[in-house]
């Protein structure tokens, strides 16, 4: 039985000095999970492709070739099964919910402090939540950054279900190094895994999310101090499942979810 990685198992690995190895194994499991694979398929549908029909047509063509004892030519796969309905529909759903921007009930909120493109980033988070099932927002000092499920592995508390930490990961090309950023309540740490030998090293030790620079009256630099937030600067944007829709619907994947986009802890 595979290990279920939670914030508690992360703390255990951290106490045992196995944090880098845990991060590698955790991300590997995330990339083999059902939600991650479905999110990859959703990206293909979003690009006006149809992976479900493509796989079926490939299997069908291979079956015909075997029945003909490899004498039959490959059956061409029709392009008519592809359309932009998936992207168009979800763009409309995201625009319907978030197209007018965010409005705060408290008139005292200074929205300008949230960044110039805050509304666009919220709409982006909502769109990825619609097609992937969930997305994640990271408050980076003075602006919002959106992470997709295909680039961010969340760590939830096994008792409360709350998001307590997470790992962002990326590799620019198959022949380049893998990069990780671990986000915790008390700061972030960067790691790099070499392509050759799979050696994982800490490239940036844990740093605070904010840097406070103190200067002298004359303008000289006196000190630079780190400061963190009172809570983890990450949030989950999820779409509540609608059980009345067929979960197994593959032709236009992810349409079984309702349009109720929610920001979740």
Model-predicted segments: where are they?
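Intrinsically disordered, low-complexity, compositionally biased regions/tails
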Residues: 21, 38, 56, 103-105, ...
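Extended, Lys/Arg-enriched charged tracts that mediate electrostatic binding to polyanionic substrates
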Residues: 116-219
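Extended, helix-rich architectural segments
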Residues: 1-144
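Residue-level detector of alpha-helical hydrophobic segments embedded in or interacting with membranes
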Residues: 30, 46, 71-73, 149, ...
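Intrinsically disordered, low-complexity segments enriched in proline/serine/threonine
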Residues: 37, 53, 78-80, 156, ...
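Extended, charged amphipathic alpha-helical segments
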Residues: 210-265
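Generic hydrophobic, helix-prone segments enriched in Leu/Val/Ile
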Residues: 43, 92-93, 125, 179-180, ...
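Intrinsically disordered, low-complexity regions of eukaryotic proteins
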Residues: 43-45, 81, 186, 192-195, ...
């Amino acid at each position: 039985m595979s290990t279920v990685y939670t914030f508690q198992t992360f703390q255990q690995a951290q106490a045992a000095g196995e944090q880098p190895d845990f991060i590698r194994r955790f991300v590997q499991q995330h990339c083999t999970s059902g939600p991650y694979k479905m999110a990859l398929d959703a990206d293909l549908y979003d690009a006006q492709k149809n992976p479900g029909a493509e796989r079926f047509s490939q299997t069908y063509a291979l079956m015909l070739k075997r029945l003909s004892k490899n004498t039959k030519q490959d059956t061409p796969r029709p392009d008519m099964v592809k359309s932009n309905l998936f992207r168009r529909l979800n763009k409309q759903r995201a625009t319907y919910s978030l197209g007018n921007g965010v409005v705060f009930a408290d008139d005292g909120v200074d929205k300008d402090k949230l960044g110039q493109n805050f509304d666009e980033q919220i709409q982006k988070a909502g769109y990825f939540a619609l097609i992937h099932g969930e997305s994640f927002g990271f408050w980076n000092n003075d602006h919002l950054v959106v992470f997709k499920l295909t680039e961010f592995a969340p760590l939830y508390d096994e008792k409360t279900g709350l998001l307590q930490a997470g790992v962002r990961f990326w590799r620019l090309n198959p022949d380049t190094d893998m990069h990780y950023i671990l986000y915790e309540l008390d700061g972030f740490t960067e790691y790099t895994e070499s392509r050759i030998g799979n050696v994982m090293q800490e490239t940036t030790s844990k740093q605070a999310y904010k840097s406070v620079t103190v200067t002298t009256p004359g303008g000289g630099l006196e000190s630079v101090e780190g400061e963190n937030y009172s809570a983890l600067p990450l949030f989950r944007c999820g779409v509540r499942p609608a059980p009345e829709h067929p979960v197994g619907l593959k032709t236009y994947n992810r349409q079984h979810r309702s349009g109720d986009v929610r920001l979740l802890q």
